[in-house]
Design a protein with these regions (language model features):
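Extracytoplasmic/secreted proteins, especially bacterial periplasmic and envelope-associated proteins
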Residues: 45, 49, 53, 74, ...
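C-terminal lobe and pocket-closing loops
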Residues: 122, 208-278, 283, 310-313, ...
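Hinge/capping helix and adjacent helix->loop/strand transition within the periplasmic-binding protein
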Residues: 22-25, 81-87, 101-188, 239, ...
Length: 327
């Protein structure tokens, strides 16, 4: 009798999963995009644009929930343990790949605890300096760095931030240790850079374009392999062409569901994501943020999973070599 009862529970659970997969999205139930950071930041803005663009292809209300803390790991952990019905997804940035190295104790496994829905966009980085630096181009900057070893300050927006990661990679690329100055966000770091309190910063184009255009900071290069076409940055050379070979750093966003979400639900979410990324209004909003919407191939879940694995392999050694952990 007990065996029969247990079997009936298993059958019921299986049927419930199958019904959830077939009927997704469940009528009158919204889809929640969890953002593992505070409202108002770049990832939050991307998520809100996505929520609007995904409503029609999903045929459901899409809302954003901010679950901030611990460099994005609290929100990501919540999604990893959420119901596997497709109604809770995660929008995360490069921290999805860097957290395994930045945090020595992780509450989830990036590669094993999620279904990868696809990549969304990429945001290039810029290497910039205080306006009073004597160097006017990257070649002159390299000479200046060589003449001032042990005296250079490199700002960032906080441990684990995009600017921190880019700064670590830059130091290793030029084989020079700099004094890392972490701030609580990009705004105060940029203010001190403009004021001459710190020397260098490597941060997103979304944060530096206006200052570069206004000539309140000096631009030494973009971290892409090709020059950017935006008006403020079209004349800024790539670091690669200036001599820092293969220096390619971008901040990206991807979308994920809890591991075990039914395959056909994952397929519906992926299809809705791809439709959203081809929405002209969404593309225009991303361009205004300085972001580039990725191709259909990179929106593929399996393709994105391979990309994240490569990013983990790329950033892990950089972070461990620096010995700068978030916990």
């Amino acid at each position: 009798m007990k065996k029969l009862f247990a079997l009936s529970l298993i059958v019921a659970a299986t049927c419930q999963t199958l019904v959830s997969a077939a009927d997704f999205p469940i009528k009158d139930k919204s889809v929640t995009i969890v953002v593992p950071f505070v409202a108002g930041g770049p990832t939050d803005r991307v998520a809100r644009d996505l929520a609007e663009a995904m409503r029609k292809p999903l045929g459901a209300t899409v809302v954003v929930e901010n679950v901030a803390g611990a460099g994005g790991t609290i929100g990501a952990n919540k999604v990893s343990k959420a119901p596997q019905d497709g109604h809770t997804v995660l929008l995360h940035h490069i921290g999805m790949a860097t957290s395994p190295a930045l945090y020595r104790k992780m509450p989830y496994n990036t590669m094993d605890d999620f279904e990868f829905l696809g990549m969304v966009n990429e945001v290039p980085m810029t290497l910039v300096g205080r306006p009073t630096l004597p160097a006017n181009n990257y070649k002159e900057l390299v000479t200046w760095i060589g003449q001032n070893k042990g005296k250079i300050n490199l700002a960032n927006a906080g441990l684990g931030a995009a600017s921190h990661l880019c700064g670590l990679m830059f130091q290793q690329a030029v084989q020079t240790d700099m004094t890392t100055v972490p701030y609580k966000g990009t705004a105060p770091a940029l203010n001190d850079l403009m004021g001459g309190q710190v020397d260098l910063l490597c941060d997103k184009t979304t944060n530096t374009s206006a200052q570069i255009e206004g000539k309140t900071i000096k631009a030494y290069g973009v971290t892409t392999m090709k020059r950017l076409t935006t008006p403020a940055l079209k004349d800024v050379p790539t670091l690669n062409e200036s001599g820092l070979k293969d220096f390619n750093v971008s901040i990206w966003h991807g979308m994920y569901a809890p591991k075990g979400t039914p395959t056909d639900v994952v397929a519906k979410l992926n299809a809705a994501l791809k439709t959203a990324l081809r929405d002209p209004d969404f593309v225009k909003k991303q361009e205004a943020l300085g972001a580039v919407v990725v191709s259909d191939k990179r929106t593929d879940g399996a393709e994105h999973k391979k990309f994240v694995a490569a990013e983990i392999d790329k950033w892990g050694p950089v972070i461990k070599a620096a010995g700068q952990y978030a916990d």
